[in-house]
């Protein structure tokens, strides 16, 4: 009878099993700094692999997108349904300097706004800011009952919807194209544009829950370190040298 190998028998130990290394020992924590328009500047921390050989940690961090609740950035729970996207543009020491990258609503908030017996009106506008950021803004609005209205439904006619959408587009275009990205962010936080639309469309049909529900960054200009440092309240270059108060003394060598 031929004798073959028994596969069920365990093989002899050729070498000891390698000890699993904790991947976190090769990583470092970096702080994330929010730009000027927001009240809270320290957003949180992010992990990245340490610089080894040709792999630079700074290159891995640049371009990283961070999503933060506006409630955390403003210390106000009324903004909890809005999410802000921040993009890491520069790394200074152990800090990641970010810039505004976009805005969005939470899905539960959007679903809670849609109800029966009313008309939903949406508009989107592509605008260029004065500092050459190309953005697309998405607006949302809902019709509401007029004062002393008995009728249950608040449906707007097609002509009214078109007129409201035209007015929404005009206001967004005017407000966004006449300011920088930082100024636009300052307008988006207190919802200035939404209130402006609500006021301007009162004569066509009363509106409620008017919001800029989403902001999408389509194109950005060439990276400017000076502008980013100004946004974070720092100076990239010290143009004026520090005055030296030290008294000059001529050194006299003693003759040997």
From Swiss-Prot:
Gene Ontology CC annotations of this record: cytosolic small ribosomal subunit
Subunit structure: Component of the small ribosomal subunit. Mature ribosomes consist of a small (40S) and a large (60S) subunit. The 40S subunit contains about 33 different proteins and 1 molecule of RNA (18S). The 60S subunit contains about 49 different proteins and 3 molecules of RNA (25S, 5.8S and 5S).
Keyword Acetylation: yes
Subcellular location: Cytoplasm
Principal location class: cytoplasm
Pfam families: Ribosomal_S3Ae
Full protein name: Small ribosomal subunit protein eS1
Organism: Chaetomium globosum (strain ATCC 6205 / CBS 148.51 / DSM 1962 / NBRC 6347 / NRRL 1970)
Family: Belongs to the eukaryotic ribosomal protein eS1 family.
GO MF terms held by the record: structural constituent of ribosome
Modified residues (N-acetylalanine): 2
Classification via PANTHER family: 40S RIBOSOMAL PROTEIN S3A (PTHR11830)
Matches recorded under InterPro entries: Ribosomal_eS1, Ribosomal_eS1_CS, Ribosomal_eS1_euk
